[in-house]
Amino acid sequence: MSIAENKKAFFNYHIEERFEAGIVLAGWEIKSIRSGQIQLTDGYVVIKDGELFLIGLRINALRSASTHVNPEPDRTKKLLMHKAEIRRLIGKVEQKGHTLVPLNLHYKGGRVKVDVALAKGKAEHDKRHTIKDRDWQREQGRLMRHKVSAPHKD
């Protein structure tokens, strides 16, 4: 079950490869995620000292959050992956134009996981082409719907 989607990532990037990673969260963050207080659209992944960190994931604290902890909505979260996967990602990210973007957050076995994609940025003309294709698909659906619902003349 998906918690949050990053629809902007599919528009701004060509997704080349997907990976699943665990995420280190505090208790109040889990409670906020379960209530839907999460925003993923501006998130991105950086590599520091051989570890992955998710930046820009916004988790708004609930009013009933702990009183002894000062909730920080834009806190940097550490991602958990196997060292071999991280090394492979480091090699690919160092290539020109590649980056890591979060695609979605979901539950797996009661834990929150994040899908991270190895992606390459789209040029402006690619984005326009994506919009044109999406509009054409929508128009095709409309045409087919009207064609099917039109009465036949014998």
Swiss-Prot record:
Family annotation (Pfam families): SmpB (PF01668)
Q: Which residue stretches does the UniProt record annotate as biased composition, category Basic residues? A: 143-154
**Region labeled Disordered — which residues?**
123-154
Where is it chiefly localized? Answer: cytoplasm
Extract the InterPro entries matched here: SmpB, SsrA-bd_prot, SsrA-bd_prot_CS
Going by the UniProt record, its keywords in alphabetical order are: Cytoplasm, RNA-binding
Gene3D superfamilies annotated for this entry?
Answer: 2.40.280.10
Its cellular-component GO annotations read:
cytosol
Q: Name one GO biological process term.
A: trans-translation
Protein name, per record: SsrA-binding protein
Q: Which gene encodes it?
A: smpB
